[in-house]
Amino acid sequence: MQLAWILWLASVLPPQAADSLCLSATVYLEARDQSARGQQAVAEVALRREESGLWGDSMCDVVTARKQFAPTIVSPRTRLGNTEAWAQAVSIAIESERNWALPPGERKEIVPGASHFMAHAIAAPSWRNAYQVATIGDHTFLRVQRLRPREG
């Protein structure tokens, strides 16, 4: 299946299903070759951004914000062809959403406060000197600014 098809499907699904699909695609594209912990950390960054409201009002808005996550960086024709990795990404996304639905004090956070991450194989972005929260696999997770949950 192609990324373009997944994003189209997300546009016609009910919001909760669409958000799960968008998060799954992001975990797959960003971290399919990483450990489960690395995949959970990627999902956590996306969920933290969604909660902040600074990158959009839904998970699909967050992960399709210009040049923020793989769904807007890779070609829409990118095939998500590894069925085992896709199944793992879906599982990680759903598990991460359940965890993030808990009150903040009860969540299991892997990269506390991280709002960004970078793959070591990619050129370092301008915020590369932010506070490093963790390195998991070939990703470094960073806190660039203090994110506050939106009110209400």
Annotate each PLM feature:
Residues M1-W8:
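Sec-dependent signal peptide recognition
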Residues W8-L9, L13-G152:
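Bacterial extracytoplasmic/cell-wall-associated proteins, especially those involved in peptidoglycan
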